[in-house]
Amino acid sequence: MTATSPYLELGYVARAHGLRGEVAIRALDPASETLDTVDRIWVRTRAGVEREMRLEALRPTPKEDIVVLEGVESRNDAEALVGAKVFVFREDLEPPAEGEFFQGDLVGLDAVDANGNALGRVEEIWTTGEVPNLVIRASGREELVVPFADEFVPTVDLEARRIVIHPPEYVEAGRKGAESGGGPEDAE
């Protein structure tokens, strides 16, 4: 989904829960409380069927939210949703503050270095610590994982679909070693 999309990807339906049609929705960002703030979601099943669904009830748990969705009455109904991607409507969210971004808007941006050289495309965001990490991939290159912090990402231009990256020093050192072969014979 692009920055102009009416939806932002929140997570996915991880599993059916119980016998009465509840589902467990796991957010891509474990710290996200977004589902608490909306009344509806957009669901895309593995079969490609898309539809709006209303939230009737929500119970947060440490790993996921247990949700009752309108029209999902049985375990079979819930199991049919397992693996479905879950999106929220952009219009239902508070806009991000100046200099802040919805993580979903960063996925798909072209990543370049300070000189404009292509590094790849932001394919994923890992939220494993205090700072999210951008996963940048390009054909024929190693995956680049960069902390989403001003020091490493000085510019985000959603209109141009571009992000400027200052890779961490360890990435630059690894790249130089790979270019020269990186073996002890190259250390002279």
Curated annotation (Swiss-Prot):
It is found in: Cytoplasm. Pfam families: PRC_RimM, RimM. The keyword Cell membrane does not apply. Its main location: cytoplasm. It comes from the Bacteria. InterPro entries: PRC_barrel-like_sf, PRC_RimM, RimM, RimM_N, RimM_N_sf, Transl_B-barrel_sf. GO terms for molecular function: ribosome binding. One of its GO terms (biological process) is ribosomal small subunit biogenesis. Binds ribosomal protein uS19. The PRC barrel domain binds ribosomal protein uS19. This is Ribosome maturation factor RimM. It comes from Myxococcus xanthus (strain DK1622).
